């Protein structure tokens, strides 16, 4: 029987109230899927790690849910369907799943064909010298957009999606900072100096639909890097609407590229987030692509 794993904390806890409706839909199916809504990340990981290798699971939640459960999905090589009920849903957007009503998305997640997608892996060192290993599906942000992600997580519950991200962006502009970063992509030295952000994308969007890297692909065997120089507040306000439209790539001070391996060094420590989930301050970051490492159900992409 297929495991359906619900994150009851997704969308500010509102997904918990949808459990009876999800159960009613599943009760009509044969064979009956197994429905679980674990309260902790560890409980969810334990459930996934007990699944037979290569079996199908369905996740109900958003980018953060997938990110927290990703280590088990990769280890067990699970074929994964996604019902996007999170605040951001940038992974679902890239897979063509974001416009479906949830019962239709659930039916597709249970029965749809899977396709291999790339993931990223970040090995990073925090300010205490401790090493961490973090996989991601959508984005690994460093700098301003990570600070925005943290502020968004702390934002008012009545805001969700893109409005919540824009609220956090405007609040973070009041505390604008820059970071001195040394970077290399596939052995090639990138520009040194202060940056507003130095981020990695696997999906075209981040932050609930901001088109940070419009041409990014989840299945091309590469990741995309995005560097923005030391823009001030006025420059950021000029850049923001272009980010929303995906027309920022040709702006002075913005650089992009593709890679398989990327290294970042920031002695002062740069804010880091994966799939919108806060990680901490990092001095060293090594990122590489894990090509075709996750089997995902896709929509019309």
Segments predicted by a language model, with ranges:
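Short acidic/glycine-rich loop or secondary-structure boundary segments that cap or lie
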Residues: 145-148, 191-193, 205-209, 233-236
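Glycine-rich phosphate/pyrophosphate-binding beta-alpha loops
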Residues: 141, 145, 199-213, 278
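ATP/nucleoside-binding phosphotransfer catalytic cores, i.e., glycine-rich phosphate-binding loops
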Residues: 15, 185, 217-218, 223, ...
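Short glycine-/acidic-enriched loop or helix-start segments at secondary-structure transitions
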Residues: 15, 68-71, 92-94, 209-210, ...
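ATP/NTP phosphate-donor binding region
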Residues: 1-60, 67, 71, 75, ...
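Catalytic core of DAGKc-family lipid kinases
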Residues: 3, 38, 74-79, 85-196
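Short Gly/aromatic-enriched secondary-structure transition segments
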Residues: 152, 213-216
């Amino acid at each position: 029987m297929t495991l359906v794993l619900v994150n009851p904390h997704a969308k500010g806890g509102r997904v918990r109230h949808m459990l009876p409706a999800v159960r009613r839909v599943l009760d009509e199916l044969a064979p009956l899927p197994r429905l679980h809504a674990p309260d902790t990340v560890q409980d969810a990981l334990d459930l996934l790690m007990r699944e037979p290798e290569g079996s199908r699971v369905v996740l109900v939640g958003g980018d953060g849910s997938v990110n927290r459960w990703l280590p088990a999905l990769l280890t067990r090589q699970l074929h994964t369907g996604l019902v996007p009920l999170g605040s951001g849903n940038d992974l679902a957007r890239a897979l063509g799943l974001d416009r479906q009503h949830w019962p239709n998305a659930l039916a597709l997640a249970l029965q749809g064909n899977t396709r291999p997608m790339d993931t990223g892996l970040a090995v990073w060192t925090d300010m205490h010298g401790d090493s961490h290993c973090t996989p991601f599906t959508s984005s690994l942000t460093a700098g301003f957009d990570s600070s925005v992600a943290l502020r968004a997580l702390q934002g008012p519950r009545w805001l969700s999606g893109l409005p919540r991200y824009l609220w956090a962006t405007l609040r973070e502009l009041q505390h604008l900072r820059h970071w001195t970063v040394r970077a290399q992509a596939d052995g090639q030295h990138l520009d040194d100096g202060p940056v507003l952000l130095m981020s990695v994308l696997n999906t075209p969007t981040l932050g609930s639909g901001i088109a940070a890297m419009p041409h990014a692909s989840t299945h091309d065997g590469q990741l995309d890097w995005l560097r923005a120089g030391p823009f001030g507040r006025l420059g950021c306000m000029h850049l923001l609407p272009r980010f929303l439209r995906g027309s920022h790539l040709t702006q002075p001070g913005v650089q992009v590229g593709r890679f398989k391996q990327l290294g970042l060094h920031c002695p002062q420590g740069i804010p880091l987030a994966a799939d919108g989930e806060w990680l901490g301050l990092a001095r060293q970051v090594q990122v590489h692509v894990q090509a075709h490492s996750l089997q995902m159900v896709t929509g019309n992409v």
